[in-house]
Amino acid sequence: MKCAHFVQQQCLSCRHINQPMPVQVAAKSQVLSQLLSGFEVEQWREPVFGPESGFRNKAKMVVLGAAHQPILGIVTPTGEPVSLCDCNLYPIDMQQLLHRLELFVRQAGIPPYNVDKVKGELKFILLTRSQIKGEYLLRFVLRSHKSIERIERELPQLLSEYPQIKVVSVNIQPVHMAILEGEEELFLTEETRLSEQFNDVPLFIRPKSFFQTHPEIAAKLYQTAREWVAELKPDTLWDLFCGVGGFGLHCASKQSALTGIEISAEAITCAKLSAEAMGLTQVNFTALDSTGFAQGCDAKDKPDVVIVNPPRRGIGESLCQSLSAFAPKAILYSSCNPHTLAKDLACIQGYRVQKVQLFDMFPHTDHFEVLVMLLKDA
């Protein structure tokens, strides 16, 4: 993939952009193989990867420049602001909308937040795209409430031009710190969630809920998880760090009981909506800390299968110990950090590594997703 920003050393996020996708994936596979070399892996599945461009469904744009000439993008290594509205990771329609949002900020006259001077209002514009319908969730991250009226003044024209923008919100982030969002979220549209669908599972996205950024690979990841779990025919499932429920909802059946645990209340709201839409009645999604939940359960609550999809820090020693004690017949671990994955696998006692498969969720970078099936020792 060609990128002028990379050639000019303005943006270095896609550090492996000059390598063909198969070469990138081979290098990632080698890293994973080395990290898991201490484990006896019964089956290495072929890695899964997708297109090199137009795949990303979320843009996190720093708002730079001035009110009369705003720039949505990043600060270069040399300190210059550069627009990334034409980033090839985004679909063409998303690039076009990002350019229109630069114009929107100028028309609204909202001063970008200046970190050095601690002045200005608009910090970030966050844009999420639903691949099923090409609809959008748009968020403005502001320092205060001062500029909300300016956004509301220009919003009707924007929505008339882009009716596919279904959800618009303002997030208030008042502190002078490198924090993406604050606690307060104000909706400027009647709709408060974006509809999405992976495979046959309806999913919903709210402003603060985590969602995978590569829909094509995420759908394949969820489908693979479904197939692996189906082989076990579980009656009870736990989905820890469940987010909006993608893994659990793919793996549950109308006969099985699913418990989903996630710290984000917004994500749990979305998961409940999905379960209702699917007609699943033996489902319990709850906003709790996953480690605390597991530690508070009794042995009689032991599930047949536990699914974990933690953040980059992994599940940690305490949860590893809890899972080892519960001894479900299988643990399905989806990881975005192979280093913490290897550490956790070494901590979980009494299991063998049945299957491992790499999913290249983050092309042109060193990052990737890994799906691992652990089976209880006989």
From Swiss-Prot:
The active site is at residue 336. Keywords: 4Fe-4S, Iron, Iron-sulfur, Metal-binding, Methyltransferase, rRNA processing, S-adenosyl-L-methionine, Transferase. Pfam families: tRNA_U5-meth_tr (PF05958). S-adenosyl-L-methionine binds at residues 212, 241, 262, 309. Catalyzes the formation of 5-methyl-uridine at position 747 (m5U747) in 23S rRNA. It is an enzyme of class 2 (transferase). It comes from Shewanella halifaxensis (strain HAW-EB4). One of its GO terms (biological process) is rRNA base methylation. Transmembrane segments: none annotated. Belongs to the class I-like SAM-binding methyltransferase superfamily. RNA M5U methyltransferase family. RlmC subfamily. The keyword rRNA processing applies. It comes from the Bacteria. [4Fe-4S] cluster binds at residues 3, 11, 14, 87. The gene is rlmC. It catalyses: uridine(747) in 23S rRNA + S-adenosyl-L-methionine = 5-methyluridine(747) in 23S rRNA + S-adenosyl-L-homocysteine + H(+). PROSITE patterns: SAM_MT_RNA_M5U (PS51687), TRMA_1 (PS01230), TRMA_2 (PS01231). This is 23S rRNA (uracil(747)-C(5))-methyltransferase RlmC. Its EC number is 2.1.1.189. GO terms for molecular function: 4 iron, 4 sulfur cluster binding; iron ion binding; rRNA (uridine-C5-)-methyltransferase activity.
